């Protein structure tokens, strides 16, 4: 797996290929919102304001984010001024003012770049104002919505055949804000092996009472279609794509069970993003242990119970949000059926 590199593309990633990108582009910035996320720095892991970084600067000569703010405020250079005069030029404004005010103080990656990694909620909490907190801290994605999906299915040791979906969760993730806007979540009654095995219950946390009397897969698929229509996801002008942790859910499990039951597979299930591949493009390593490795690699806390479909979806969404904040542009990884 390869990552986008500054040298390979003139210092900028290519959003249509998926990878880390340098943002914003050269001024003037024409988008209606301001991206304060990553730009290529002078060493791996450096996010934002590379021009403020001098690799020869000693730690003693470095100023942290709050020291920078204090010095700027004391000099009458409000860090909110760019919001009133053109937020798109925020970084260049801060660069010029910081250089004038701070003089010989050189800023290290633990200084001003910290401004870029702080969340918009924290910006508001630290007094940077609601206007800054409201800015969207992500580069534009190729899709309006990401549909995060993670099935749980009947299982045992040795494996039973055919496996049947017993939990069907979907999170609708806004591609601009990377926030969850809607949730579809249903349990499914298995019909070939209606009795869950102890192994299955221990692995997934799903007990027999949670699937007894629930709709069949055919009925659940009909409700998924109704939900998709209600959420505006079937509009041809709305671009959406499913996201899974691996290819199993939509390449193996759903088409396999639908084939067994003689059910059609909707076209929207035939393209997806494999988060493992996206993560490997962004981070340069393959997550052998799936969500656990991805959360660890991004210093994220695992949400909920492993192998709970809905909790796994929340973890996927959180990982996607973190990668997007770092400048990753998601693209389809599945091949056409």
From Swiss-Prot:
Highly expressed in the brain, heart, thyroid and testis. Expressed at low levels in the muscle cells, liver, pancreas and kidney. SUPFAM superfamilies: Ribonuclease H-like (SSF53098). Mg(2+) 2 binds at residues 150, 249. Its cofactor is Mg(2+). AMP binds at residues 152, 307. Transmembrane segments: none annotated. Binds 2 magnesium ions per subunit. The active site is at residues 152, 307. One of its GO terms (molecular function) is metal ion binding. InterPro entries: 3-5_Exoribonuclease, ERI-1_3'hExo-like, Exonuclease_RNaseT/DNA_pol3, RNaseH-like_sf, RNaseH_sf. It comes from the Eukaryota. Pfam families: RNase_T (PF00929). Keywords: Exonuclease, Hydrolase, Magnesium, Metal-binding, Nuclease. GO terms for cellular component: plasma membrane. It is an enzyme of class 3 (hydrolase). Its EC number is 3.1.-.-. Residues 146-320 form the Exonuclease domain. Mg(2+) 1 binds at residues 150, 152, 312. PANTHER family: 3'-5' EXONUCLEASE ERI1-RELATED, 3'-5' EXORIBONUCLEASE 1-RELATED. Interacts with PRNP. This is ERI1 exoribonuclease 3. It comes from Mus musculus.
